[in-house]
Amino acid sequence: MGGVNIYAIIESGGKQYKVTPGQLVEVDLLDLAEGDSIELDKVLMLNDGETVTIGSPTISGAKVTATVAGHIKGDKVFAYRFKAKTRNHKKMGHRQLYTVLTIGEILTGGAAEKPARKPRAKKTNEVTTDGA
């Protein structure tokens, strides 16, 4: 399989997305113009190819840079209201607005440089034979 799999799990709009550099991601509408850059700092998990870092709840210092590629509308979702025996019915439709992001870099920000915890020294009970 060869290549290094660098990816991150980010949060945007209350939803979580697994992103890799160069990927196009559709997130809920953001108030940004096409071509604007954004830094997503809610990184929940980070895999840099060697180590996996899991945040609690987020990883401090880790960021994902992205550029707005455009805005689109999703597929139309229909809701239908119907009342029996009264000829009362209503069909409603909704199209969700999305922002398309092009993922740039995944910056660790020193997230993988956490020092390992040292094991605790075990206490030993010494027994003396001199009666003290």
Swiss-Prot record:
Region of interest called Disordered, as start-end residue ranges on this chain: 111-132
Functional summary from the UniProt entry: This protein binds to 23S rRNA in the presence of protein L20.
What subunit structure does UniProt give?
Part of the 50S ribosomal subunit. Contacts protein L20.
**Name of protein:** Large ribosomal subunit protein bL21
Q: Which family does it belong to?
A: Belongs to the bacterial ribosomal protein bL21 family.
| Gene Ontology CC: one annotated term | ribosome
Q: Return one GO MF term.
A: rRNA binding
Lineage of producing organism: Bacteria, Bacillati, Chloroflexota, Dehalococcoidia, Dehalococcoidales
Q: Name one GO biological process term.
A: translation
This chain's source organism reads Dehalococcoides mccartyi (strain CBDB1)
Domain of life from the UniProt record: Bacteria
Alphabetized, the UniProt keywords read:
Ribonucleoprotein, Ribosomal protein, RNA-binding, rRNA-binding
